[in-house]
Regions:
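Membrane-interfacial helix-loop segments of redox and metal-homeostasis proteins
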Residues: 1-183
Length: 183
């Protein structure tokens, strides 16, 4: 959680800084590298400011700082109660749903990819698909033996869920942008 939180936090911070420069001076973001990868074009859409007209990356800065702190706390030996984990699960799920919504819009509606956004997608996908089986195994969703056993069974194989999620995104990008690798 700590390393993933820091990687996503840094990407969100970079997007926020470059989005600010784009709005202030019109300076092209560093991730505008070709006709397909254009963070600047993505940042100028309504999808980039969904909640309260606040840039999405500001939510990422706050959210991933929390994720990194949770990871650091666990590494330091903290034990957190079930309510905390339920709220963490709700936050991670909301972020996952939001990021997959943003992925869909970037690929199929906006028509541009954002490299830093893709880093956040990749990191959060890994966090989510490891966290869910861990939470099941830890009894966060209740002590139903079937849920606990299911989590214990899936946790060592959570990488499969991550690969499937990455494959769906990768195939969607290849289908939607068939000329992407011909540049």
């Amino acid at each position: 959680l700590m390393l993933g939180g820091l990687a996503a936090w840094f990407s969100a911070l970079t997007l926020a800084r470059e989005g600010y420069q784009l709005a202030l001076t019109g300076e092209k973001p560093s991730c505008d590298i070709n006709p397909f990868f254009s963070c600047g074009d993505v940042m100028q859409t309504w999808q980039a400011t969904v909640f309260f007209e606040t840039p999405n990356q500001l939510f990422g800065i706050g959210g991933y700082a929390v994720v990194a702190v949770i990871g650091a706390s666990l590494m330091a030996g903290a034990t957190l109660n079930r309510l905390f984990w339920l709220l963490t699960t709700a936050g991670l799920f909301a972020a996952y749903a939001w990021l997959m919504w943003m992925f869909y819009h970037a690929v199929f509606v906006i028509g541009f990819l954002c490299l830093y956004c893709m880093v956040v997608w990749a990191v959060h996908i890994a966090i989510w698909w490891v966290f869910v089986p861990w939470a099941l195994k830890a009894g966060i969703f209740g002590s139903n033996p079937k849920l606990v056993k299911s989590g214990a069974r899936w946790l060592p194989y959570s990488w499969i869920l991550i690969i499937i999620n990455y494959a769906v995104i990768g195939l969607s990008i290849l289908i939607q942008f068939p000329l992407l690798f011909s540049i």
